[in-house]
Amino acid sequence: MAGKSPLINLNNGVKMPALGLGVFAASAEETASAIASAISSGYRLIDTARSYNNEAQVGEGIRNSGVDRAEMFVTTKLFNCDYGYERALRAFDESLGRLGLDYVDLYLLHWPTKDWNATIQSWKAAEKILGDGRARAIGVCNFLEDQLDELIAASDVVPAVNQIELHPYFAQKPLLAKNRALGIVTEAWSPIGGAINDGDGDNHGGRKHPLTDPVITTIAEAHGRSAAQVILRWHFQNDVVAIPKSVNPERIAKNIDVFDFALSDAEMAQLDELDTGVRIGPDPRDVDTSSFAEFV
């Protein structure tokens, strides 16, 4: 079957699906099964990373899918421990080897690090990989506004994508606007979001979750959709690429079934008002080349 997701244009003319499957923290067995379910459900964007330890299963799943490689959009990422020009080039070769592919569609720097020179040198390596045709586009993850400015000032290529934590409870409106102004597509990791402290000890032990938030569930009921589908549609209408992670075949299928309904301006505004400004993941200013060593 054909891919279900609309395509968006990156700043170098490459087309990228507007929704894909993330495989963070999925085991090898879970990844293989999830890839099969996703592709059969119409996904064409798969997002992995060196630190996820499942690149091999992603590549195997794509090869076994029966879908032409040219129809797929594969993203992987350079991890912090491999930063530096030569190390980044070697790490990319290793990722390609694990994937069993000749090229990736998008190669991302996973984090900005306190060792800014290593970050810049890694980006220079990504520029070479792009120039050699082994990545169709390059980008970054978790870069803040000033970090984007510094990177661009020291580089020849403007990132095509900035993949960031973004969900209704952490909407990052200023960074989203910055990305747009620079011609950078925003991609959301953890697009559904997770539980946050809400200050009400009588409500879920002082925590709430987007999937049970009454604002979201009320909108979902009005459309006959799930809360997750409403959130993913909110991303799409904000021109944000979402990569929800799931290993459940039913949820995988539902997550991409969001392109045949629309949220009203009032509903979009209601969802926007849920922003707490509270980050669930790490602060991009506190990450170094040795951060998250337990993942590799």
Curated annotation (Swiss-Prot):
Supply the Gene3D superfamilies for this chain.
Answer: NADP-dependent oxidoreductase domain (3.20.20.100)
Q: Which Pfam families match?
A: Aldo_ket_red
The record's keywords, sorted A to Z, are: Alkaloid metabolism, NADP, Oxidoreductase, Plasmid
Recorded protein name is Morphine 6-dehydrogenase
Q: Which residues form the signal peptide?
A: none
Provide one Gene Ontology biological process annotation: codeine catabolic process
Which residues make up the binding site for NADP(+)?
13-22
Q: How does it assemble?
A: Monomer.
Single GO term (MF):
aldo-keto reductase (NADPH) activity
Binding residues for substrate = 110
